[in-house]
């Protein structure tokens, strides 16, 4: 009997380049077991709430699947034996979630907003334009004299 599950797993940030291959492996595991994937989201590297193995960031992946218990057991076992997977969470759902998650919606809304460090540099640059304009005026006055 197939049930709906929501799965989130976190991958070691040094293994981020292997995440697409891991996703493909887990997708094929579900599909070969006659399961279906209703939603798959790669959230990328995100800040952890607390350090895990002295790490402050991890690569997050969300899966919403419909599969039977044997497939789920195989999936959780593969998480357990994969050293790159830091944590995983499996939640049984009443129905399939196919709409975009809140995290992905907030990423889309931010869209082209600069990263935190970039924003700070831009603010610094904007703050410098006013004194720079004063200096230019002063330079013009000095060159005229």
Curated annotation (Swiss-Prot):
Compositional bias ranges of the Basic and acidic residues kind: 105-124
Positions in coiled-coil regions: none
Residue ranges with Low complexity bias: 132-145
Keywords recorded for this protein, A-Z: Ribonucleoprotein, Ribosomal protein, RNA-binding, rRNA-binding
Highest taxon of source: Bacteria
Disulfide bonds: none
GO terms classed as biological process: translation
Region (Disordered): 97-145
GO CC, any one term: cytosolic small ribosomal subunit
Family matches, as InterPro entries: Ribosomal_bS6, Ribosomal_bS6_sf, Ribosomal_S6_plastid/chlpt, Transl_elong_EF1B/ribsomal_bS6
RNA-binding among keywords: yes
GO molecular function: small ribosomal subunit rRNA binding; structural constituent of ribosome
Record-stated family: Belongs to the bacterial ribosomal protein bS6 family.
PANTHER family reported for this sequence: MITOCHONDRIAL 28S RIBOSOMAL PROTEIN S6, SMALL RIBOSOMAL SUBUNIT PROTEIN BS6M
HAMAP family referenced in this protein's UniProt entry, alphabetically: Ribosomal_bS6
Function: Binds together with bS18 to 16S ribosomal RNA.
Protein name in UniProt: Small ribosomal subunit protein bS6
Organism of derivation: Stenotrophomonas maltophilia (strain R551-3)
């Amino acid at each position: 009997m197939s049930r709906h599950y929501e799965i989130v797993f976190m991958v070691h940030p040094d293994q981020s380049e292997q995440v697409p291959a891991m996703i493909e492996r887990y997708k094929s595991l579900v599909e070969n077991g006659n399961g279906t994937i209703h939603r798959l989201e790669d959230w990328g590297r995100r800040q952890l709430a607390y350090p895990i193995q002295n790490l402050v960031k991890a690569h997050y992946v969300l899966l919403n699947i419909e599969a039977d218990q044997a497939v789920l057991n195989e999936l959780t076992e593969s998480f357990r034996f994969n050293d790159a997977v830091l944590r995983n969470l499996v939640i049984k759902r009443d129905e399939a979630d196919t709409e975009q998650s809140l995290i992905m919606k907030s990423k889309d809304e931010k869209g082209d907003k600069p990263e935190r460090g970039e924003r700070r540099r831009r603010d610094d640059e904007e703050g410098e334009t006013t004194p720079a304009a004063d200096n230019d005026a002063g330079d013009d006055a000095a060159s005229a004299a």
